[in-house]
Amino acid sequence: MSTYLIGDVHGCLDELLALLAQVDFDPQHDTLWLTGDLVARGPASLDVLRYVRSLGPAVRMVLGNHDLHLLAVYAGISRNKPKDRITPLLEAPDADELINWLRRQPVLQVDDELKLIMAHAGITPQWDIETAQMCAREVESVLSSDSYPLFLDAMYGDMPNNWSPELTGLARLRFSTNALTRMRFCFPNGQLDMICKDTPENAPAPLKPWFELPRLVSPEYSIIFGHWASLEGKGVPEGIYGLDTGCCWGGNLTLLRWEDKRYFTQPAFKVEAEITNADEIAAAAKDPFSYL
């Protein structure tokens, strides 16, 4: 019985199955943790959702920003971008079932026995575990409710970017969503910066990666995150594990077996995502992952 943690899949089903075959994954006995962004950019978002859903209780996943964007597109709130390659999913006969299943998935996983915390982007240094769980439950509650389109319509935006217990309503939900699914850099006081997508060594002062700031989460807990492919899993402190290694961009899909902390990788079979606009082309010239 093993615990396997895998980074952002982004519609790369073949690589996911090949990686699981490397470790002889058995859903009857093993548990699979997924850092979110199951969909978009890769060729098989529909089949990834079908497969992950079929695993039932063997899966512990969190939603990523691309998963939330899919929900917004399906609800008619956001535009379907061709580069996301989700049209087959949107038009699938079981799309309603898959979308309703997806929106009932958590944005945070905490396992007190394994001392593991997982969120797509990480945990803001302004939160302790209890606050993170409270804010995650609030987001999950509205996503699973009939009023979820109202939340999806309001979730886009970078403000507020500073945590306060006094935040309420949609502003509070937007901060929590950004902290859990979009965060990369923070100011020294823990305030989120939602603009910079650079690598840590190229980020302007005084910005720091969220994991370099003092944290309120107990050091007894390890934090698992995805989202930040340009890190390639490197440069993070002890007890922090970044698992997005850019499979859909021609990198790898990475798996961490928790019991012995052994890594397994599956190289991308081909580059699946395309760089399509001037901003992305300019960013990619500086850093091929900066536009994620």
From Swiss-Prot:
Keywords: Hydrolase. Signal peptide: none annotated. The keyword NAD does not apply. GO terms for molecular function: bis(5'-nucleosyl)-tetraphosphatase (symmetrical) activity. It catalyses: P(1),P(4)-bis(5'-adenosyl) tetraphosphate + H2O = 2 ADP + 2 H(+). It holds the Pfam family Metallophos. Its EC number is 3.6.1.41. It is an enzyme of class 3 (hydrolase). Hydrolyzes diadenosine 5',5'''-P1,P4-tetraphosphate to yield ADP. HAMAP family: ApaH. Belongs to the Ap4A hydrolase family. This is Bis(5'-nucleosyl)-tetraphosphatase, symmetrical. The gene is apaH.
